[in-house]
Regions:
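Conserved class I S-adenosyl-L-methionine
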Residues: 1-41, 52-56, 60, 76-79, ...
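C-terminal helical/coil "lid" or tail adjacent to the Rossmann-like core of SAM-dependent
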Residues: 2-18, 191-247
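Class I SAM-dependent methyltransferase SAM/SAH-binding core
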Residues: 44-46, 50-99
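A short acidic, Gly/Pro-enriched loop at the edge of an enzyme's catalytic core
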Residues: 98-109
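A short SAM/SAH-binding and catalytic strip from SAM-dependent methyltransferases
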Residues: 108-121
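A short glycine-rich, Lys/Arg-flanked "PGG" loop and its adjoining helix->strand segment in the class I
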Residues: 123-138
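Conserved catalytic/acceptor-binding region of the Class I
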Residues: 140-204
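Core SAM-dependent methyltransferase catalytic element
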Residues: 186-188, 253-263
């Protein structure tokens, strides 16, 4: 992870655990509700990760529809293959969002959840999304603005330093609040923008904040951004805060419903 969508095997497994949390499950359900898939839809899942997204979309469409799920990470695709191998109308492939290997107007719907914040060449990637949608086709684009983060810790100065060090894990950490003009520039109509806040008040292992904490620690230490001692002290502080029942974490992400005009 970093300025690329590639993951190590360890990072992919860590991310898979995050996808199992109630917050991630609710997010995927929200995305599916917004797109209201039809039984014969051809759907593109951009950045399918460990495969939860295409597997769940397959439950919404019948065998007349098909899901093409792509990811740039071999480690993620390995996990997705395990999850989707028994579903005949899912095709998994390694591909880049800035050069989608599909013909023009191939899809009725598309999903890209926390993908574009990791892409340097954003406008090319969004133009590719618009290109492969059929006229009238719809998509959900969903990204985070890390400026929205509220995370209580005893040592807020250390918290700020660690969060700032983590901000470069993607090229566009504030994209969630900046997407609309980019989407319009490639000819897509923005029909709805909706915030989705992830709120955790406990640091249990099934919470989003727990897995984000672990991912941040791994990232900032492995990249030499923060020393192991400082990162460990940060985690210990969060655990002590939780023991005192004072955990408070809130991160707002933004869901954009877009459509390709029919004319």
């Amino acid at each position: 992870m970093g300025d690329t969508l590639e993951y190590t095997e360890e990072e992919a497994q860590q991310e898979e655990s995050t996808f199992k949390t109630p917050a991630a499950i609710a997010r995927r359900q929200l995305v599916r509700e917004k797109l209201d898939f039809q039984p014969d839809d051809d759907v593109l899942s951009i950045g399918c990760g460990p495969g939860f997204e295409p597997a769940e979309i397959a439950e919404d469409i019948c065998q007349n529809g098909h899901i093409h799920a792509i990811d740039q990470s071999e480690a993620m695709l390995t996990l997705a293959e395990r999850r989707c191998s028994s579903t005949s109308n899912i095709t998994l492939s390694r591909a880049d969002a800035v050069a989608l290997p599909f013909a023009d107007e191939s899809f009725d719907a598309a999903v890209a959840v926390q993908v574009y914040e990791y892409i340097e060449d954003l406008d090319t990637a969004l133009a590719e999304l618009a290109r492969v949608l059929r006229p009238g086709g719809r998509a959900v684009v969903y990204d985070t603005d890390f400026d929205s983060l509220v995370w209580h810790a005893t040592d807020q100065e250390r918290m700020r330093a660690i969060c700032e060090a983590f901000n470069d894990h993607c090229p566009r950490p504030h994209l969630g609040s900046q997407l609309a003009p980019h989407l319009r520039d490639v000819g897509l109509t923005v029909e709805q923008v909706e915030p989705n806040s992830i709120l955790n008040t406990r640091l249990d292992e099934d919470t989003f904040v727990y897995h984000l904490m672990e991912a941040i620690k791994t990232y900032v230490v492995s990249r030499g951004k923060i020393t192991a001692n400082v990162a460990t002290a940060w985690v210990n502080d969060l655990r002590e805060t939780d023991a005192d029942r004072e955990t408070f974490f809130n991160l707002t992400q933004y869901l954009y419903v877009v459509q390709k005009p029919t004319e």
